[in-house]
Amino acid sequence: TIYTPSNYIMPSRMQKYMDLYSNKGSSNNLSQSGREQGIRRLMSINLLKRLESSVYSFNLTLTRIKDLINQTIDMINSYKSGSKVMDMVDYSDASDFDEDDQNTDFFSVGKKVKIDLADMDYITWLHELEQDAENLELLSLMIADITPEHDIKLQTLFDLLRDKMANPINLGNKKVIIFTAFSDTADYLYANVSQFMKQNYGLDTAEITGTVDGKTTIRNLRSDLNTVLTCFSPVSKGKAMLMPNNPAEIDVLIAT
Protein backbone atom coordinates (compact mmCIF):
# COMPACT_ATOMS: atom_id res chain seq x y z
CA THR A 1 0.00 0.00 0.00
CA ILE A 2 2.96 2.37 0.34
CA TYR A 3 3.02 2.76 -3.45
CA THR A 4 -0.72 3.45 -3.89
CA PRO A 5 -1.63 6.51 -1.79
CA SER A 6 -4.16 7.69 -4.37
CA ASN A 7 -6.37 4.75 -3.37
CA TYR A 8 -6.98 6.49 -0.05
CA ILE A 9 -8.03 9.90 -1.33
CA MET A 10 -11.57 10.57 -0.13
CA PRO A 11 -14.19 10.60 -2.91
CA SER A 12 -15.22 14.15 -2.01
CA ARG A 13 -11.64 15.33 -2.61
CA MET A 14 -10.96 13.36 -5.76
CA GLN A 15 -11.88 16.15 -8.16
CA LYS A 16 -9.21 18.35 -6.62
CA TYR A 17 -6.52 15.88 -7.61
CA MET A 18 -8.04 15.16 -10.99
CA ASP A 19 -7.65 18.87 -11.73
CA LEU A 20 -4.20 18.90 -10.18
CA TYR A 21 -2.95 15.97 -12.24
CA SER A 22 -4.48 17.47 -15.35
CA ASN A 23 -2.43 20.61 -14.77
CA LYS A 24 0.68 18.44 -14.55
CA GLY A 25 0.07 16.96 -17.95
CA SER A 26 -2.16 13.97 -17.16
CA SER A 27 -5.65 13.75 -18.57
CA ASN A 28 -7.24 12.45 -15.35
CA ASN A 29 -6.54 10.90 -11.98
CA LEU A 30 -6.57 7.40 -13.41
CA SER A 31 -3.18 8.05 -15.02
CA GLN A 32 -1.60 8.65 -11.63
CA SER A 33 -3.52 5.81 -10.01
CA GLY A 34 -2.54 3.51 -12.87
CA ARG A 35 1.08 4.52 -12.49
CA GLU A 36 0.97 3.71 -8.78
CA GLN A 37 -0.61 0.32 -9.43
CA GLY A 38 2.04 -0.36 -12.05
CA ILE A 39 4.87 0.49 -9.69
CA ARG A 40 3.37 -1.71 -6.99
CA ARG A 41 3.18 -4.66 -9.39
CA LEU A 42 6.70 -4.01 -10.60
CA MET A 43 8.03 -3.88 -7.05
CA SER A 44 6.37 -7.20 -6.24
CA ILE A 45 8.02 -8.77 -9.27
CA ASN A 46 11.26 -6.94 -8.53
CA LEU A 47 11.46 -8.39 -5.03
CA LEU A 48 11.28 -11.86 -6.55
CA LYS A 49 13.97 -10.94 -9.08
CA ARG A 50 16.26 -9.69 -6.34
CA LEU A 51 15.61 -12.77 -4.22
CA GLU A 52 16.54 -14.90 -7.22
CA SER A 53 19.68 -12.79 -7.66
CA SER A 54 20.87 -12.96 -4.03
CA VAL A 55 19.45 -12.91 -0.53
CA TYR A 56 21.71 -9.91 0.12
CA SER A 57 20.16 -7.88 -2.69
CA PHE A 58 16.67 -8.93 -1.62
CA ASN A 59 17.31 -7.85 1.96
CA LEU A 60 18.57 -4.42 0.89
CA THR A 61 15.39 -3.70 -1.05
CA LEU A 62 13.26 -5.11 1.75
CA THR A 63 14.98 -2.78 4.22
CA ARG A 64 14.44 0.25 1.97
CA ILE A 65 10.72 -0.53 1.67
CA LYS A 66 10.44 -1.04 5.43
CA ASP A 67 12.18 2.29 6.07
CA LEU A 68 9.85 4.06 3.63
CA ILE A 69 6.79 2.54 5.30
CA ASN A 70 8.03 3.43 8.78
CA GLN A 71 8.75 7.02 7.73
CA THR A 72 5.23 7.32 6.37
CA ILE A 73 3.74 5.79 9.53
CA ASP A 74 5.68 8.32 11.64
CA MET A 75 4.43 11.15 9.43
CA ILE A 76 0.80 10.06 9.78
CA ASN A 77 1.14 9.60 13.54
CA SER A 78 2.49 13.13 13.90
CA TYR A 79 -0.32 14.54 11.80
CA LYS A 80 -2.65 16.89 13.65
CA SER A 81 -5.47 18.98 12.28
CA GLY A 82 -3.37 21.33 10.17
CA SER A 83 -2.72 21.02 6.49
CA LYS A 84 0.02 18.47 6.03
CA VAL A 85 1.14 17.92 2.46
CA MET A 86 2.79 14.61 1.70
CA ASP A 87 5.33 14.77 -1.10
CA MET A 88 5.26 11.56 -3.11
CA VAL A 89 8.35 12.23 -5.22
CA ASP A 90 10.51 9.56 -3.55
CA TYR A 91 7.89 6.82 -3.45
CA SER A 92 9.00 5.31 -6.74
CA ASP A 93 12.78 5.22 -6.49
CA ALA A 94 13.88 3.39 -9.63
CA SER A 95 17.29 2.42 -8.27
CA ASP A 96 15.98 -0.91 -6.96
CA PHE A 97 14.73 -1.96 -10.40
CA ASP A 98 16.71 -3.49 -13.20
CA GLU A 99 17.33 -1.50 -16.38
CA ASP A 100 14.38 -2.91 -18.32
CA ASP A 101 11.91 -1.97 -15.59
CA GLN A 102 13.41 1.51 -15.20
CA ASN A 103 12.61 2.21 -18.84
CA THR A 104 8.85 1.81 -18.37
CA ASP A 105 6.50 4.79 -18.46
CA PHE A 106 5.86 4.37 -14.73
CA PHE A 107 9.20 6.08 -14.08
CA SER A 108 9.02 8.74 -16.77
CA VAL A 109 5.71 10.50 -16.16
CA GLY A 110 3.81 12.00 -13.26
CA LYS A 111 6.54 11.79 -10.64
CA LYS A 112 5.96 14.99 -8.70
CA VAL A 113 2.74 14.35 -6.81
CA LYS A 114 1.67 15.86 -3.50
CA ILE A 115 -1.30 14.71 -1.48
CA ASP A 116 -2.69 16.52 1.54
CA LEU A 117 -3.24 14.08 4.40
CA ALA A 118 -6.41 16.02 5.20
CA ASP A 119 -7.79 14.77 1.88
CA MET A 120 -7.05 11.13 2.66
CA ASP A 121 -8.58 8.33 4.67
CA TYR A 122 -5.26 8.18 6.43
CA ILE A 123 -6.62 6.06 9.29
CA THR A 124 -7.27 3.15 6.93
CA TRP A 125 -4.00 3.75 5.14
CA LEU A 126 -2.14 3.80 8.46
CA HIS A 127 -3.70 0.49 9.50
CA GLU A 128 -2.72 -1.20 6.25
CA LEU A 129 0.79 0.28 6.36
CA GLU A 130 1.23 -1.12 9.86
CA GLN A 131 0.16 -4.54 8.62
CA ASP A 132 2.66 -4.32 5.77
CA ALA A 133 5.41 -3.24 8.17
CA GLU A 134 4.68 -6.22 10.42
CA ASN A 135 4.75 -8.67 7.51
CA LEU A 136 8.00 -7.26 6.14
CA GLU A 137 9.62 -7.36 9.57
CA LEU A 138 8.69 -11.02 9.88
CA LEU A 139 10.16 -11.68 6.46
CA SER A 140 13.37 -9.90 7.47
CA LEU A 141 13.69 -12.06 10.56
CA MET A 142 13.24 -15.19 8.45
CA ILE A 143 16.18 -14.35 6.17
CA ALA A 144 18.43 -12.81 8.84
CA ASP A 145 20.15 -16.15 9.49
CA ILE A 146 21.15 -16.64 5.85
CA THR A 147 24.77 -15.56 6.19
CA PRO A 148 27.30 -16.27 3.41
CA GLU A 149 28.19 -19.54 5.15
CA HIS A 150 24.54 -20.61 4.94
CA ASP A 151 23.82 -19.11 1.52
CA ILE A 152 23.28 -22.21 -0.63
CA LYS A 153 23.53 -20.27 -3.90
CA LEU A 154 26.87 -18.75 -2.90
CA GLN A 155 28.20 -22.08 -1.68
CA THR A 156 27.09 -23.68 -4.95
CA LEU A 157 29.05 -21.02 -6.81
CA PHE A 158 32.10 -21.88 -4.72
CA ASP A 159 31.66 -25.52 -5.73
CA LEU A 160 31.55 -24.50 -9.40
CA LEU A 161 34.70 -22.44 -8.97
CA ARG A 162 36.48 -25.36 -7.32
CA ASP A 163 35.51 -27.58 -10.24
CA LYS A 164 36.67 -24.93 -12.72
CA MET A 165 40.06 -24.72 -11.03
CA ALA A 166 40.42 -28.50 -10.88
CA ASN A 167 39.08 -29.20 -14.37
CA PRO A 168 39.66 -26.22 -16.68
CA ILE A 169 38.23 -26.43 -20.20
CA ASN A 170 41.61 -25.41 -21.60
CA LEU A 171 44.78 -26.41 -19.78
CA GLY A 172 45.85 -23.64 -17.42
CA ASN A 173 42.79 -21.50 -18.15
CA LYS A 174 41.52 -20.12 -14.85
CA LYS A 175 39.46 -17.26 -16.26
CA VAL A 176 35.93 -16.83 -14.86
CA ILE A 177 33.27 -14.23 -15.68
CA ILE A 178 30.26 -13.88 -13.38
CA PHE A 179 27.36 -11.72 -14.58
CA THR A 180 24.47 -10.43 -12.46
CA ALA A 181 21.58 -8.04 -13.11
CA PHE A 182 22.01 -6.03 -9.90
CA SER A 183 25.02 -4.05 -8.68
CA ASP A 184 24.14 -4.96 -5.07
CA THR A 185 24.58 -8.62 -5.90
CA ALA A 186 27.84 -7.82 -7.68
CA ASP A 187 29.10 -6.16 -4.48
CA TYR A 188 28.04 -9.19 -2.44
CA LEU A 189 29.73 -11.60 -4.83
CA TYR A 190 32.91 -9.54 -4.98
CA ALA A 191 33.18 -9.40 -1.18
CA ASN A 192 32.89 -13.17 -0.89
CA VAL A 193 34.29 -14.57 -4.13
CA SER A 194 37.42 -12.39 -4.10
CA GLN A 195 38.29 -13.63 -0.62
CA PHE A 196 37.57 -17.24 -1.56
CA MET A 197 39.70 -17.14 -4.71
CA LYS A 198 42.58 -15.31 -3.06
CA GLN A 199 42.76 -17.57 -0.03
CA ASN A 200 42.35 -20.85 -1.90
CA TYR A 201 44.05 -20.20 -5.24
CA GLY A 202 45.98 -16.95 -4.90
CA LEU A 203 43.98 -15.47 -7.79
CA ASP A 204 42.83 -11.88 -8.13
CA THR A 205 39.28 -10.69 -8.72
CA ALA A 206 37.75 -7.50 -10.11
CA GLU A 207 34.25 -6.02 -10.17
CA ILE A 208 32.82 -3.72 -12.83
CA THR A 209 29.32 -2.24 -12.61
CA GLY A 210 27.64 0.71 -14.24
CA THR A 211 26.83 2.52 -10.98
CA VAL A 212 30.14 2.69 -9.08
CA ASP A 213 33.86 2.69 -9.72
CA GLY A 214 35.36 -0.71 -10.26
CA LYS A 215 37.10 -2.76 -7.59
CA THR A 216 40.03 -5.11 -7.70
CA THR A 217 42.10 -7.13 -5.25
CA ILE A 218 45.31 -6.03 -7.00
CA ARG A 219 46.88 -3.24 -4.99
CA ASN A 220 47.63 0.06 -6.71
CA LEU A 221 45.92 -1.05 -9.91
CA ARG A 222 43.50 1.38 -11.51
CA SER A 223 40.01 -0.07 -11.46
CA ASP A 224 38.60 1.62 -14.57
CA LEU A 225 36.99 -0.57 -17.21
CA ASN A 226 39.87 -0.53 -19.71
CA THR A 227 42.53 -1.38 -17.14
CA VAL A 228 40.47 -4.19 -15.63
CA LEU A 229 39.71 -5.72 -19.04
CA THR A 230 43.36 -5.43 -20.07
CA CYS A 231 44.45 -7.34 -16.97
CA PHE A 232 41.65 -9.88 -17.39
CA SER A 233 42.37 -10.56 -21.07
CA PRO A 234 46.02 -9.56 -21.50
CA VAL A 235 46.59 -11.22 -24.87
CA SER A 236 43.56 -9.79 -26.71
CA LYS A 237 44.02 -6.35 -25.11
CA GLY A 238 47.75 -6.12 -25.79
CA LYS A 239 48.77 -5.82 -22.16
CA ALA A 240 52.43 -6.52 -22.94
CA MET A 241 52.58 -3.25 -24.89
CA LEU A 242 50.24 -1.16 -22.73
CA MET A 243 51.53 -2.28 -19.33
CA PRO A 244 54.96 -3.85 -19.98
CA ASN A 245 56.17 -3.45 -16.40
CA ASN A 246 53.05 -4.70 -14.66
CA PRO A 247 52.75 -8.48 -14.25
CA ALA A 248 49.34 -8.25 -12.52
CA GLU A 249 46.59 -10.41 -13.96
CA ILE A 250 42.89 -10.70 -13.10
CA ASP A 251 41.37 -14.17 -13.31
CA VAL A 252 37.85 -13.58 -11.99
CA LEU A 253 35.63 -10.78 -13.31
CA ILE A 254 32.27 -9.94 -11.71
CA ALA A 255 30.12 -7.61 -13.80
CA THR A 256 26.60 -6.32 -14.42
Regions found by a protein language model. Name each.
Residues 230, 234-243:
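AAA+ P-loop NTPase catalytic core and its hallmark functional loops
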Residues 1-223, 243-255:
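Helicase motor interdomain insertion/brace
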Residues 225-229:
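Long, amphipathic, Lys/Arg-enriched alpha-helical "connector/arm" segment
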